[in-house]
Amino acid sequence: KLQLGYGGDTLNTALYCARLGVEAHYVTALGEDARSQWLIDEWRGEGLGVSHVVRIPNRQPGLYWITTDAKGERSFSYWRGESAARQLLSAESTLTRLSVELVTYDLVYFSGITLSLFDQQGLERLWALLRALRGASVRIAFDGNYRPRAWASKELAQSVFAMALRHSDI
C-alpha cells in the first residue's frame, strides 16, 4: 500500500512543537509546483508558521520512500539531488532576509540532515547565519541526525558536524 505523507527530522520537530501549542515556524525551500503548495497548505493547517518557506522556480520538494520489512525495520530511498531545499541559502538575499527575520526567535533548530543538503558555499552561509543569530542571543540547537548515504565520506560528515557543534548552544 502506497501512502503519501510528509516528514523529516526538522519538520517533525517543528510540527510536534506546534501541536503542543508552541509557536513554531519552518524554514526551508520548496518549488512553485502543486506538491510544494500542498505541503505549505498542510503545514499551515497543522498550525506551523510557513512565512520563511522560500519558493524556488523550477525546483521541487525532495522525496523519500520508506519501505518496512516483515520485522518492522524501515529502509529509506532518497531523491533529493534537485530538491529546492538544497538551494535555500544559494541567494545572498535569502541569507540577509533570514538573518533579519530570525533574530526575534528564542531558538533555531537544525540537524545533520540539514547539513547534508548543502554544498560548501551553502554551509559557509549557514555558519554566517548561525553566527549572526547567536550574536543576537538566539539559542541554536543542533540535532546530530546522521545518514551515511547522505555524505560523500564519514570524515566529511565528522568535519561538518564538528563545525555545527561550534555554532550551537544545545
What would you call each of these model-derived segments?
Residues K1, E32, Y146:
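Short, glycine/acidic-enriched loop or turn micro-motifs at the edges of active sites
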Residues K1-G7:
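Short pre-catalytic strand/loop immediately N-terminal to key active-site residues, enriched for Gly-Thr
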Residues L4, A29-L30, D119-Q120:
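Residue-level marker of alpha-helix boundaries and capping positions
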Residues G8-T13:
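Glycine/serine-rich anion-binding loops at beta->alpha junctions
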Residues A14-E23:
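Alpha-helix C-terminal capping segments
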Residues E23-I113:
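Conserved N-terminal subdomain of the carbohydrate kinase-like
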Residues L107-I170:
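Conserved beta-alpha-beta core of the PfkB/ribokinase-like small-molecule kinase fold
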